[in-house]
Amino acid sequence: MGYLMKTTSILLVALLVLVMMFGFVGCQPTDETAGSSSDNGPADPITFTFMTYNVRVQVSNDADKRVPYDTVKDRAPLILQHIADADPDVLCIQEWTGNHTMEVAPSLEEQYEILVFQRGDFFESCAILYKKDRFELISTEHFWLSETPEEPSKSWDAEYLRIYASTLLRDKLSNKTFRAGTTHLDLAKVARGKQRKMVVDHTANSAEPAIVCGDFNFDARHDLYLYCINTLNDCRTLVTNATTTASYNGYNVDGQILDDDGAVKNGYGYPIDQIFVKRDAFTVHSYNVLNYLIDGKFSSDHFPVVVELSIND
């Protein structure tokens, strides 16, 4: 009888030890719960930083008209500083040229994959850069903003060939995919309106969460803007603390100074460099125009625009 009681006690102690061990293991955070808040509420959203930046082509007579340092080689350190300050995960660039490939790309290519999309009739291109360690490239696409988008062409009153280019990316942190698109619309009135509709409709009809950004050559006061915000969301209007300033500066040091009525003194009161997103697809956490000089100099005749956003479930 004593032997039986002793054996039973040993078994009970062993069972208790096992329960404690497995109970402790079961309480450890898993990969799925590690990012959750401590009160078992929803996890913090996984955000990424997105920038659009017209870096300006090199024009031979700019040194006479505007500033003495306006070559891409001179401006490259300033461009790179703006990029470093924002540290974008995805960067869409307009007016990228061979000069930028030589002077800017070497400092970025270790961290970023650089995809350049040629317009076809001119030396400038659109470029999309994304961090190699953060994103996986699934596919790319581009088409011309014309009545024959499948071939290099221009229509209506357009002065230049214009394109839309995009990448479909998978975020390795969230395992979500999204489309990042960019463009640079013409200045001609009819063409600009037609091109705007093409890129806005394409973004709205995307099967994935989609962004379209770039130099639209119009701001929020223009009638062309209404169709954009009736179809997509403007990131600038989705946050309460958005920077209120122009993105185009024209190498005018007063370009970022506001009058009492909110208009910029050089006549440009709102950004023409836009970031639109597909409705209900993203949450925008911040919006900024990097409207400052570097060492007293302009990096471009445009300031970069930066947003932080997350993809909705």
Report the location of each language-model feature.
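Bacterial N-terminal signal peptides
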Residues: 13-23
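Positively charged n-region of N-terminal signal peptides that target proteins for export
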Residues: 1-14
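Structured beta-strand-rich core segments of catalytic domains in phosphoester-bond hydrolases
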Residues: 90, 94-178, 289
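N-terminal, active-site-proximal structural segment of metallo-dependent hydrolase catalytic domains
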Residues: 26-106, 311-313
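Active-site beta-strand/loop signature of hydrolases that rely on acidic residues for catalysis
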Residues: 48-55, 79-102, 129, 167, ...
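Solvent-exposed loop/turn segments at secondary-structure junctions
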Residues: 55-58, 96-100, 119-123, 134-135, ...
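Surface-exposed cleft-lining segments at the edges of enzyme active sites
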Residues: 64-68, 149-156, 182-189
